[in-house]
Each structure stands twice: as structure tokens, then as C-alpha cells.
Design a protein with these regions (language model features):
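Hydrophobic/aromatic beta-strand elements that line small-molecule binding cavities or substrate pockets
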Residues: 22, 77-84, 107-114
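Short, conserved beta-strand/beta-arch hydrophobic-aromatic motifs that form part
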Residues: 75-78, 91-96
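Short, conserved beta-turn/loop elements at beta-strand boundaries and strand-helix junctions
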Residues: 86-91, 118
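Hydrophobic ligand-binding cavity/cleft-lining segments
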Residues: 1-50, 54
């Protein structure tokens, strides 16, 4: 299997993107493993992950949460494939979700990991949104819910699954 993606998504007609930088308490190796092998530890519903950390290999996972307070929880499938993997440094993957996310568009998430004296600087770029509304909603979820929750779970101060958006 090639270590290069067979096709990188064309994002030219979907110019909206987001960038989030955050200091994480976990070290780069712990974060790399979490993003490539342990989605069900911090993000996905338990037992709802099919993922092999190899370039070009498709993955699938589900999250489960209520979209609005007081409504029943629903399942939210996520699909993708790894585009680039550099252990303990970089993860790049495609990210496809439904309504309230990428609306079926194949977007690209790039996670860059830089070691710090205590922890890691994580830079997340998520590109390929059709409009600013989808970008803004996804940015808020990454910034306010998902990444803080990941930091808590990986350092032993939180539990999975993550809180609802």
C-alpha cells in the first residue's frame, strides 16, 4: 500500500476553513495515537470505530448525542481516510459528516503536533467547507467541546464520550 494518498480532495470550490491552536497537556505521541487508533477513547461512541492508521485506508466511526437539549440522542456517522501520517508530528485525513457538519462534503483535517516543555502545541486546520455557517459551527465544536474534552480524557481528568455540541 502506498504511503501517498491516491487522490487528495479538490477544495477549490469550497474555500471556507478554520484554524485552531491549543496547548494540550498530553505529549505528542499520546495525541498521535489518540487521533489514529483511539477515537473511541475520546470522541466516538464506544465500539463504533473501524480505523486502521494507514494512508488510503478508509475509516468509519459514529458519535451519539442530542442536537438540542431535551431531544433524543441520535447517531452521527463520520467517514474518511488518512492522507498523511508522520508519527508524533502530523495527521491529515479526510472528514465527511452529514447535516450540521460537512453536509456530505469531503473536507480535510490536518493536525500538527509540536512538542512543548510540558505537553504539545496542537494546530488543527479543517478545510473545505461550502459556506461560513458550516465552518463556524464546526469551529465552535472543535474549539469549545472536542479539543478541550480530548485534553481532559487523555490526561485523566475527563471521561468519554464527549459532551454534546
Amino acid at each position: 500500500m502506498s504511503s501517498r494518498p491516491f487522490r487528495v480532495p479538490d477544495l477549490s470550490d469550497r474555500p471556507h476553513h478554520l484554524v485552531i491552536e491549543r496547548e494540550m497537556r498530553a505529549d505528542p505521541h499520546t495525541l498521535y495515537v489518540a487521533w489514529t487508533e483511539q477515537f473511541d477513547r475520546w470522541f466516538a461512541a464506544p465500539g463504533a470505530v473501524v480505523m486502521t492508521p494507514r494512508v488510503n485506508v478508509p475509516f468509519f466511526f459514529e458519535t451519539e448525542y442530542a442536537m438540542e437539549p431535551g431531544t433524543p440522542k441520535t447517531r452521527h456517522p463520520h467517514y474518511g481516510r488518512f492522507l498523511r501520517l508522520e508519527p508524533d508530528q502530523l495527521i491529515e485525513l479526510t472528514w465527511v459528516t452529514g447535516r450540521g457538519g460537512t453536509a456530505g462534503a469531503e473536507t480535510v483535517v490536518t493536525v500538527e503536533l509540536t512538542p512543548l516543555t510540558a505537553g504539545t502545541r496542537l494546530r488543527l486546520t479543517h478545510a473545505g467547507f461550502y459556506d461560513d455557517t458550516a465552518r463556524a459551527g464546526t469551529e465552535a465544536a472543535w474549539r469549545d467541546l472536542v479539543l478541550p474534552h480530548q485534553d481532559q480524557v487523555l490526561t485523566g481528568t475527563g471521561t468519554a464520550p464527549p459532551p454534546a455540541p
